[in-house]
Amino acid sequence: YPGICRNLSSAERDERIAVGTPHALRLKMDKAIAATGPLIWHDAEAGPQHARPAIFGDVVLARKETPSSYHLAVTVDDYLQGVTLVTRGQDLFEASHVHRLLQALLGYNSPAYNHHKLLTDSQGNRLAKRDKAQTLQSLRAVGYTPAEVRALAGW
């Protein structure tokens, strides 16, 4: 995000919103980091991690059509549910830097994390529903054993 609307006045923001201009609520990353200072989170595989949320720039917290971003939603949801161990795929490892920052800003304790390997096909593409990849059920249907499925995950 190049910061085009970062320093609009309240009046300018209100005017743009009133006429239906698409808009987003962003976290001013530099101010957020200054407010929390250095942060650490712990991953079961990778060990202690120094949070580097600045790699994302001013992250979106909400949009006109989406009342809450993934980052904000999972941070609040995990807290409200009392989650103490967050288990997600390795593809979401970097997002944890932002989540740790949001936890600190909201006064939440940081849960432990475990970012697991992803199941991939023979070409190394992850098995994802959105890509219409094979499902575990389809792998079982063609005869994959539990041990073979674990081998796909690198275990």
Label the predicted regions.
Residues 141-155:
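Extended, charge-rich low-complexity interaction segments
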